[in-house]
Amino acid sequence: MTLEFKLSEEEIELLPTDEDVAFYNEHGWYLSKKLLTDDETDELVNASERYYAGERDRTLPTAPPKLAYWDPTKGNVQRHNDYVHYEHDGLAKILRKPLIGAVAARLAQTHEIRIFQSTLIYKPPVEGEPSNIVPWHFDKHYWSSSNSDKMLTAFIPFHDCPPEMGTITMVDGSHRWKEIGSDDTVVRHFADRDRSQLDQMLAENASYNGAEVVKLPITIPRGHMNFHHCRTYHGSGANVSDRPRRAISLHLQDGDNRYREFPLSDGTTAAYNHDALVRRTSDGRPDYADPEYCPTLWADR
């Protein structure tokens, strides 16, 4: 089956320029133009509320071991729900807008973009809530079973997202750092790590590279989104506003990304939640191009 992806003349004007791509390559992040209409961001809010109320178009056939999946029994903490592009068609309809994939393809300098994961996030306006603080990390640590270094994430707030709402914060240029050693505890999710340990890791890696830690909270206007490289350190602070911060982290893979065996020091291999869900390739490996879970968002061939 051949998929056709096309942009309107208006959408083509919204693609990153050569200067934007150069900025992304140097800094490891890029704040987009307005890619979603106000109607689309309104629909993201409405669809997310239906999702939180229990609406699903389909459910995962099994719960992978590291699945993030908030439900009301967990209380008024920061909510993370994975695979919303699979489970909820209302959210998927907007997340699968070809323009998002085309922007990502320009930044990653690739011809094809597939969804890797989508996580619905709700950060409540609760002063002092510890789960609202996201410590420093970069995504590729959790994607060690992927062989690509072109992967990237679109952080998509459903509203204007200023620093007081706990917007995403980039460590500028950190995607170009070399890592210290091979401490493979980094493959554990930040929710399972000590925050001070992650702060120390950031400082040590910066020092190793002779770099300064430059933390940039990104003010994101409604309808815009912030793209970051899979090796860019990032985190987010408290929501000290009077309203919830609603967003989706849309994780994206280039068309060449494949599963790889990544041995860990404890004798196991790195795994990702897809490994329990996706079909297998002819040689028995998890297929990160399975269209059920990793649909193509953009292809320009």
Regions found by a protein language model. Give the residues of each.
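Non-heme Fe(II)/2-oxoglutarate
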Residues: 2-9, 54, 61, 65-66, ...
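Feature marks short, surface-exposed loop/turn motifs that line or immediately flank catalytic pockets
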Residues: 124, 162, 177, 254-256
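A short secondary-structure junction signal
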Residues: 127, 132-136, 146, 164-170, ...
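Active-site region of the double-stranded beta-helix
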Residues: 111, 140, 145, 156-167, ...
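Non-heme Fe(II)-dependent double-stranded beta-helix
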Residues: 1-26, 33-136, 142-145, 263, ...
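Short, conserved beta-strand element in jelly-roll/cupin
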Residues: 144-163, 219-220, 227, 251-254
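Double-stranded beta-helix
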Residues: 2-4, 22, 161-233
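A short beta-loop-beta micro-motif enriched in histidine and acidic residues
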Residues: 108, 139-151, 213, 220, ...
